[in-house]
Amino acid sequence: MNKIIKSIEDAQLKSEVSKFHVGDTVKVYAKVKEGNRERTQVFEGVVLKRQNGGARETFTVRKQSNGVGVEKTWPVHSPIVEKVEVVRLGKVRRAKLTYLRDRVGKKAKVKELVR
């Protein structure tokens, strides 16, 4: 049974996925359908977490918009996500940055990784 599920999931995976990690600041280009029009919307923020793997893999991005924290979660292999562009590399020591939800201002910043 697992082989059948694995073969179906492999067929649904994107061939080219951007490499990004937790703590990176990214721009997510997502397709938005409004009525009969389709446009690309850019959402820029810090990657809080990546979950699961394979076809079910998701990632969550958080940003501050007018003083309000906004989080969005997308499947990595979704056709809605056109591309994920890395703006800054972040240096973190945790797999999930949920503690950033409670922080405001400079405390909510992630150190930049210099490579």
From Swiss-Prot:
What PANTHER family does this protein's entry cite? Answer: LARGE RIBOSOMAL SUBUNIT PROTEIN BL19M (PTHR15680:SF9), RIBOSOMAL PROTEIN L19 (PTHR15680)
**What does the record list as GO biological process?**
translation
Q: Which Pfam families match?
A: Ribosomal_L19
HAMAP family with a match to the protein in the record: Ribosomal_bL19
In the record, the note on similarity to other proteins reads:
Belongs to the bacterial ribosomal protein bL19 family.
Q: Which UniProt keywords apply?
A: Ribonucleoprotein, Ribosomal protein
Described by its record, this protein's role is as follows: This protein is located at the 30S-50S ribosomal subunit interface and may play a role in the structure and function of the aminoacyl-tRNA binding site.
* Lineage of producing organism: Bacteria, Bacillati, Bacillota, Clostridia, Lachnospirales
Q: List GO terms (cellular component aspect).
A: cytosolic large ribosomal subunit
Q: Which PROSITE patterns match?
A: RIBOSOMAL_L19
Q: Listed GO molecular functions?
A: structural constituent of ribosome
- Record protein name field: Large ribosomal subunit protein bL19
Top-level lineage group: Bacteria
